[in-house]
Amino acid sequence: MTEYIHRNIDSELIAWKEDSMRKPLLLRGARQVGKSSAVKNFGKQFEYFAEVNFERNKAIKTFFQGDIDVRLIAKKISSYINVPIEAGKTLLFLDEIQECPEAIMALRFFKEDYPELHVIAAGSLLEFTLQELPTFGVGRIHSLFMYPMTFDEFLYANHEEGLILLRNEAYGNQSLDQAFHDKLVEYFRTYLLVGGMPESVLAWTKTHDFNRCRNIQEDIILTYEDDFSKYKKRVNPDLLRTTMRGICHQAGEKLTYKQISADYQSSQIREALRLLTLAGIVTPVVATSGNGIPLDAEADEKSMKVLFLDPGLLLAVLQLEGDLSQQLIELILAGTPQELVNKGGVIEMVAGLEMMRYKPCIQRQKMFYWEQKGKSVAEIDYLEIHNMKITPIEIKSGTQGGMKSLWLFMREKKLTEAFRCSLENFGSFDYIDKQDDDAIRHVTILPLYALSLLRSR
């Protein structure tokens, strides 16, 4: 039996189980991020676990045809798989539900007609199917979004719970002991290559073989592209493949459609990007004015960067494209922390992924950055809402003199707090702005291995 690795979603599932007002749960996310494993592990909380996989159990699709009687459907499933389905004792798991649109439509009726039964559904490229449904139970279904493993989950997989606890006690000017800091930096470098796909992480913990992880990552990418062909009646699979791979060449950069492909129009690439976003494979980072909350009130979707699902998968795509340079690998493994942060677009991308995944998973999160165009472009890597205030976050190592965009933004928006994220140890400093009546700007230095602390500080 495959070893289960602790996931952040575990606590969300337990809370859902205990909620007397719970709705059927739809677990959403890209293929192979660990949805099925998380539900199967959660199923141990119940006396019975009734699993239906619509890719394997095609006959069960017929149970959902015609008039929907969910109690009768549950009885039929119970008889077919020979597992008791009893309210309060059984978890009913409908996996790969995108293969049975009728089952998606039926989820709402479990809330209306059989609310005491615990029901979870999961699927991949689910949003491609949902687009064709008139409704699938808005208000009667609870969604949770799942992603590849965060850096903290990666540490858990490597049995470094104690290291996490030590790290969590440091903040601001209370730095971490250098030995622990160095160890976390090395783990972070490893995470960039191994990524957060559970199969790759498990392979790393067993073998410490980067090549084995890369083979797994390449297989996952090819599986994604095979999935695209299932929807060729709705969208051109080659367009999705070209867009997905093209995005990876622009990690940490402002997205340019022409660099993705000269064979497709911008409108086609834009539609492919929308579908990849819905599928959880990419996340746009949209430019915003940063004038107030909410950040998307003045967002400009014509200017965006894109976060790819996982750093390991990103490098696998570059490998498949013949564009993964030895210099990049050497930079990740052996470059100085300052070089790695300031020269590697993948670092900026991973920082964005980390910040996004530590937010509530009940909705698809939006990410924002700021830019000011002129003779020279000023840019802030990320804008976040922290303690109900707009907070600029720079992914950068170096001196105060290299942070002109940050001082410009804080001066313009009258802000006093910011974060600088790098592979430096914890720390903070004050900057006296001579161009703004000696206003004091306070900058907290937060290591990239500690971005989960943004939730609680």
Residue ranges with predicted function:
Residues 56-88:
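Short glycine-rich substrate-engagement loop in P-loop NTPases that contacts/grips substrate
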Residues 351, 355, 380-399, 418:
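Conserved catalytic cores of phosphodiester-cleaving nucleases, focusing on short active-site segments
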Residues 1-16:
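N-terminal pre-Walker A segment at the start of P-loop NTPase domains
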Residues 426-457:
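Domain-level recognition of nuclease-like catalytic cores that cleave nucleotide substrates
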Residues 131-249:
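Interdomain motor-coupling "hinge/lid" segment immediately C-terminal to the ATP-binding subdomain
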Residues 201-378, 384:
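Accessory nucleic acid-recognition modules appended to NTPase machines
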Residues 35:
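Conserved lysine of the Walker
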Residues 38, 42:
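Hydrophobic positions on the alpha1 helix immediately C-terminal to the Walker A/P-loop
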